[in-house]
Regions:
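Metal-dependent polysaccharide deacetylase catalytic core of the NodB/CE4 family, i.e.
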Residues: 36-137, 143-161, 184-192
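A short acidic, amphipathic alpha-helical/loop segment
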Residues: 6, 30-34, 126-130, 206-207
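Boundary/entry segment of secreted carbohydrate-active catalytic domains
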Residues: 1-27, 258
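Hydrophobic "anchor" residues on beta-strands that sit immediately upstream
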Residues: 18-19, 75, 218
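Non-membrane alpha-helical structural segments and their capping/turn regions in soluble enzymes
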Residues: 91-96, 166-169, 198-201, 205
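Catalytic-core region of carbohydrate-active enzymes that cleave or remodel glycosidic bonds
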Residues: 108-109, 131-143, 163-183, 205-211
Length: 272
């Protein structure tokens, strides 16, 4: 067996798809139901200091007692206690905005939060470092890449595109139908209230139906699931001759070898 170090996703797949929606608004109820119906996974990024806050007739935050029902089966992510621009904060106010939000949200999660979305998409190195110290492992920006690359730094994670991108369906077809030689990630983000404000729910409904039709071709995951899996793959340990691979993580990990796709079991060894 020759080590290739090529990341594969569960089942030996070469494609992964994840979603990220911000602000914890009332329209998330409809959106989360759509994702569940289509077998998709999303990280919903909330501001725990703004539960129930109404901004306009069509934009209102969910009450806290609705979270467990609406986001069942999905992932919660941090978005700052009050949606403050983190690059305008420092010291104790920056720490409080991040850490207190995380503490509150974790009362509605079955595991520690590791994913964050930068409010307004703005950040600096101090904010990223504060997130790391708080236990976050990933943070999404709003800078679209237009491609399917896997980020080298999850705390500065640029998504593929926003759902309003005019090339959304073109990107979906490229992702699902083009031959994938290297691992691919499609990362879509947005705000659910935009569908009501712009009366265009058909955009996300058409997109999700298309992705559901190709469900067997990609791994649908939350942001946090993706991070944990990729880090588990990166932590694989190899013998000098490449005939033995040890997986110290709690996740089964797939990788490409000269013999084809192979699963290295959690806590186990793959030998050839």
């Amino acid at each position: 067996m020759i080590r290739f170090d090529t990341l594969l996703f569960p089942g030996g797949l070469r494609r992964a798809f994840t979603l990220s929606y911000d602000d914890g608004v009332t329209q998330d109820r409809r959106l989360a139901a759509l994702f569940r119906d289509c077998g998709l996974k999303c990280t919903f990024n909330l501001n725990s200091g703004l539960y129930g806050h109404r901004f306009s007739k069509k934009v209102a935050r969910l009450e806290e007692d609705a979270l467990d029902e609406i986001y069942a089966g999905q992932e919660l992510g941090g978005h700052g206690l009050t949606h403050a621009a983190l690059d305008h904060l420092s010291g104790a106010p920056l720490a409080w905005e991040i850490v207190e939000d995380k503490r509150r949200l974790e009362t509605h999660s079955d595991r520690p939060l590791i994913m964050f979305a930068y409010p307004f998409g703005t950040w600096n190195d101090a904010a990223a470092e504060q997130l790391r110290m708080a236990g976050y492992e990933g943070a999404r920006t709003v800078a679209s890449t237009g491609d399917f690359r896997i980020p080298p730094d999850f705390l500065r994670w640029d998504p593929t595109c926003h759902h309003k991108d005019p090339k959304l369906m073109e990107l979906a077809r490229r992702f699902a139908e083009e031959k994938a030689e290297e691992p691919r990630l499609f990362y879509l983000w947005g705000h659910a209230y935009e569908f009501d404000l712009e009366d265009n729910w058909q955009i996300i409904e058409e997109f999700c139906r298309y992705m559901a039709e190709h469900a067997g071709d990609f791994w649908a995951c939350t942001n946090g699931e993706f991070i944990r899996y990729v880090k588990a793959h990166r932590s694989l340990e190899y013998s000098v001759d490449g005939h033995m691979i040890f997986n110290s993580s709690a996740l089964d990990v797939w990788t490409q070898t000269d013999a084809g796709p192979a699963c290295v079991p959690a806590g186990g060894v793959l030998r050839r």
